[in-house]
Amino acid sequence: AWVRAAQMQSATLEELVQLQHANETARHRVVGLVIETRPDAVTPDALTLIRQLGATKIQMGIQSLDQQILDSNDRGIRIERIQRAFELLRAFGFKIHAHAMVNLLGATPESDKCDYRSLVTEAPYQPDEIKLYPCALIEGARLCRDFDSGAWIPYTEDALMDVLAADVLATPSFCRISRMIRDFSSNDIKAGNKKPNLRQMVEQR
């Protein structure tokens, strides 16, 4: 069944081009296609192919622009590579949807505010959309040992709300915040925010 499903969802580039042309005059058209990737996978060759596939927007997990925080959380990427990814995406004409995370290991409320402000206001970043997540600890994650040792402590609800409210206010009008929590069951979250209406709470603050 899986093989048959995969075959039904496969096509050659030639077949794709034919469908793209048909889409141009279709009554109900596909007007946007989003692909998610890592900043270090963004290259001219990759973007050329992604553009051929018809994508119009790229999502990337940035999480932080603080090199020390990236290293502490084993992100395995340099700030310079993230900058290059943004520059390439702009050059290729893609909309950019970045993911940012507060309360990572090594972060503080003030460093989070500064970090986010840099992401949304400074060149070469300034994404078109943002997913703004508070770090939530899931059982089995490497962060569990840092939580158990006291090296990582989740923000209090008041501190988290303060950070997120500041981030919302720092977001330029051209940038849309599309999401503010991850889709995890509260039963799976060992530590961190469990409020499903967190964004509503922040916006009412």
Regions found by a protein language model. Name each.
Residues 1-97, 101-158, 162:
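Conserved non-cysteine loop/helix-boundary elements of the Radical SAM core domain that shape
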Residues 151-205:
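C-terminal accessory regions of radical SAM enzymes
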